[in-house]
């Protein structure tokens, strides 16, 4: 079966984990890995896995985009450089999946709103953050049953799984995730908190989600909605698991989740990597399926 060729930008934890996810895909093929440090482990790993590599940043990739037929790029660098990366690749007709908190494109959580982005042929979609991918489906599961006045999420991440790029973007991580809890999750007000836990051995990613409903919660319908949504996320992140809840206290709905990874690049505790890379891969797959079926055609920036 024909596959859509992909480039990965950023050779850190997220970019390297992405190689494994995309390699398993029936419709995506990783062809290029872009970094800035010739000695980075991610670039070495990419070469071992048969990818072409450059340590000259996106500019090192641009001359090869057309000859190698690259149609989708994943940006796992930093919010500070994403806009420029996206502009350069969009001009060549490459669709960008943004795994930084730059959020210059629409925010995407696959089980909530992926279909509408594919239908609109967006040339840049933003994957928010690992915490956003782990918690916004739950907030949305509550808000689709009844109004949510306030939603707060707390993500606890193993320090070893949080690389320099994510650390440099922690403020953007907070703003983008808080905003997405409102825009995608459907809460009137959203708040996101991240805790980087240095414990050894590293602890699995844990997420706490609190929702305050506008009226007394319809417990049966909310519980059913949450369990259905968890099933949707588990289709692409099998390690996504309900630990406790939903529990109800007045108008407060509390849900406790954990996310185990597949152990592709980092061990299984790094579920935060997996939920991000799996969501990005799922997003790319939907676009790829539509391209292969001839339903959509990516547009170059000049036409857009």
Curated annotation (Swiss-Prot):
The EC number(s) this enzyme carries: 1.2.1.10
The entry's keywords: Aromatic hydrocarbons catabolism, NAD, Oxidoreductase
Swiss-Prot/TrEMBL catalytic activity: acetaldehyde + NAD(+) + CoA = acetyl-CoA + NADH + H(+)
One Gene Ontology biological process: catabolic process
Residues at which NAD(+) binds: 11-14, 161-169, 272
Active site residues of this protein: 130 (acyl-thioester intermediate)
Protein origin, superkingdom: Bacteria
Keyword Nucleotide-binding: no
InterPro entries per UniProt: Acetaldehyde_dehydrogenase, Acetylaldehyde_DH_C, NAD(P)-bd_dom_sf, Semialdehyde_DH_NAD-bd
Enzyme class, broadest EC rank: oxidoreductase
Protein's UniProt keywords contain NAD: yes
GO molecular function: acetaldehyde dehydrogenase (acetylating) activity; NAD binding
UniProt family annotation: Belongs to the acetaldehyde dehydrogenase family.
The protein, known as: Acetaldehyde dehydrogenase 1
Originating organism: Azoarcus sp. (strain BH72)
């Amino acid at each position: 079966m024909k596959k859509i060729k992909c480039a990965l930008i950023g050779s850190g934890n997220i970019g390297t984990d992405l190689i494994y996810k995309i390699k398993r895909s029936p419709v995506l093929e990783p062809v290029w890995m872009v970094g800035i440090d010739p000695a980075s482990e991610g670039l070495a790993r990419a070469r071992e896995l048969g990818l072409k590599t450059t340590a000259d940043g996106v500019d090192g990739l641009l001359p090869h985009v057309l000859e190698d037929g690259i149609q989708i790029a994943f940006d796992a660098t930093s919010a500070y450089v994403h806009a420029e990366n996206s502009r350069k690749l969009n001009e060549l007709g490459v669709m960008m999946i943004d795994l930084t908190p730059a959020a210059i494109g629409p925010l995407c959580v696959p089980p909530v709103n992926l279909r509408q982005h594919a239908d609109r042929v967006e040339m840049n979609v933003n994957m928010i953050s690992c915490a956003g991918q782990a918690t916004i489906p739950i907030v949305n599961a509550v808000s689709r049953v009844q109004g949510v006045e306030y939603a707060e999420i707390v993500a606890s991440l193993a320090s070893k799984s949080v690389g320099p790029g994510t650390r440099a973007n922690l403020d953007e991580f907070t703003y983008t995730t808080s905003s997405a809890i409102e825009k995608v999750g459907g809460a009137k007000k959203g708040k996101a908190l991240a805790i980087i836990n240095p414990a050894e051995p590293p602890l699995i990613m844990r997420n706490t989600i609190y929702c305050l409903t506008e009226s007394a919660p319809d417990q049966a319908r909310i519980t059913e909605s949450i369990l259905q949504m968890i099933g949707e996320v588990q289709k692409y992140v099998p390690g996504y698991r309900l630990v406790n809840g939903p529990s109800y206290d007045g108008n407060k709905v509390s849900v406790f989740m954990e996310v185990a990874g597949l152990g592709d690049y980092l061990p299984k505790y790094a579920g935060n990597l997996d939920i991000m890379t799996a969501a990005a891969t799922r997003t790319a797959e939907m676009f790829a399926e539509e391209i292969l079926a001839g339903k959509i055609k990516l547009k170059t920036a000049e036409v857009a």
